[in-house]
Amino acid sequence: MNVVVIGGAGFIGSHLVDRLLSHDHTVDVIDDLSTGSLANLADARAVGGGLKIHHLDATSTEADSLIGMRRPDVIHVLTTLPPSDQPPAAHARALQVVLAVLEAARRHGVGKVVVAVPATALHGHPTSRALPLKDVDIGQLVPRGVRGVVARASVDLLVAFRDLHAIEFTALAMATVYGPRQRADGGVVGAFVHAATNASAPVIDGDGRQTRDLLYVDDAVDALARAGERGGGLLVNVGTGVQTSVGELWNRIAALVPGASDLLALHGPARSDELARFAISPVRARIHLAWSPWTDLDDGLTRLVEG
């Protein structure tokens, strides 16, 4: 299979590239390297053969021409949604990438587009709903904040292009993904590991009792790879269904790094857009992607710290 990965030099994208190459697919990476790094693709480049890397803006005419030349079976879009407090241009950029990819897919006859978006943005604030959150149909989504609206709009674009141009899609609502190659500023797990391994005090927003659904990157990539061939027309939760508090997460990471348990966490004010509790149920993923998470949190954190 011929696959294009938008954002393939990033944290999750580079792991997806490794997975696709290991299954003998041909992969073209399109990445502007604004947040990604060629170092993330060192293993993939060593494999050689089926990989080509293109330092391009995904919205450029050059990227469109490349997609037209390659005519991939699947395009994976792994772009980063900015925090809600970022300037409007940053949010517009995220939508421009999805729209540009869909337009290229329409023009060049691409069969399927897979987009991953943060579940925390897409599902809003589940204050009165039972956790873990069940899968919902796209029309039932009620996102909150600018980031959530952008995530929802990305999924709406997929639906529109499927209805108008018969371009198949699968949208994955991803839990909080962690693992090797994660940047220190790429989320709470990366920040805590950086603090622990550099003997610096971790910073916790609020009291640390807020919870997240933590998904190891290999598990996330397995779902992405499966979505390339399954789950057409669906929005699918990809998570563990298990809540872990931010405070407990720090304690688990600190226990893996000598001396880190002696570090005293610094508590800052709670963020205005902070979710109090969050976890998602992957029932639809089990049914339609034949996927379930398999990496225990302690095992995943150990691999991250030791790797």
Which residue stretches match the model-derived regions?
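N-terminal Rossmann-like NAD(P)+-binding domain of SDR-like oxidoreductases, especially those catalyzing
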Residues: 1-177
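Conserved donor-binding loops in enzymes that form glycosidic bonds
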Residues: 11, 32, 56, 80, ...
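Short, surface-exposed alpha-helical segments at coil->helix boundaries
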Residues: 38-41, 155, 190, 247, ...
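Residue-level signature of the cytosolic catalytic core of signaling kinases
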Residues: 59, 129, 142, 150, ...
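NAD(P)-dependent short-chain dehydrogenase/reductase
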Residues: 127-130, 134, 148, 152-212, ...
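C-terminal substrate-binding subdomain of Rossmann-fold SDR/epimerase-dehydratase oxidoreductases
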Residues: 196-307
